[in-house]
Amino acid sequence: MNPNITILFSTRIIRLFCYGFLSVILALYLSEAGFTETQIGLLFTLTLLGDAVISLWLTTSADRFGRKRTLLIGAVLMMGAGIGFVLTKNFALLALAAIIGVISPGGSDIGPFLSVEQASLTQLISNEKRTHFFAWYNLVGSFATATGALAGGWLAQSPIVLF
């Protein structure tokens, strides 16, 4: 099997595990940080709007930038947003991180990764095996999201002080 297929599957599993984890923990973290429900809702809304704009820009530019570079740009934006959420509790800075970062407060793969990965996989997999690979691609993604949410739920219920 092409090693690029393994890389695409592996990064999807890691990313969707994190998205599932965030879907449980992020609102709790923001609440513990002192944000109101309105602020948390606004931050999530800005996150989704930012994801839509960044995704549109990256996916329409993916072939010009190169698909690998596009996936790396998305990963760097996601990492930057995560660092921003860890380092500050300033609402304006968190809003900026939410807008430009590619994170998913709802646990679904809504960023640029899905379309770029799928386009890449269609070039790496023969027509005869494509349905089989895409079935596994979706299954492992769903399983990773569910496992991440489960891990987030366990952590949220644990007696360990998180924030």
Predicted regions mapped to residue ranges:
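Transmembrane alpha-helix termini and helix-breaking/packing motifs in multi-pass membrane transporters
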Residues: 27-28, 32, 145-163
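Loop-to-transmembrane helix entry/capping segments in MFS-fold secondary transporters
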Residues: 37-38, 112-113, 125-137
